[in-house]
Amino acid sequence: MSESIKKELDKYIALISTLSGVLQIYLFGSYAYGEPGEYSDIDLLVVVEDSLDPINATVKINQKLVGNRTTPLDIVVNRKKDFSIAAKENTIQKYISDSGVLLYEAS
């Protein structure tokens, strides 16, 4: 992964992690697995508290990132409970839980 992508990820983590209720941020997809191509985007899964609405959380995350994106970015938001349940099945969440890169975890 290039230094510019690492810096961009650090910036995204710093911005997203300031939002209330953010528990974890995972990197998945081509950048996580070392296979980015010319047209690759950055794929992030954000796990939020069960009390939050994932759609509203997605809106707030995108508002935080306005003007701070230089690489295409795809964000998926899951409630903690939903992520935990889905990670036990043959789903993208299981793939992320098993092979994704945990970039942030709330203390």
Task: Identify the meaning behind each predicted range.
Residues M1-Q24, Y33-E38, E49-S107:
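Catalytic core of pol beta-like nucleotidyltransferases
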Residues D43-V47:
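Short beta-strand->loop micro-motif that forms the acidic, two-metal-ion catalytic signature
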Residues F28-S30:
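Glycine-rich beta-strand-to-loop/alpha-helix junction loops that act as flexible
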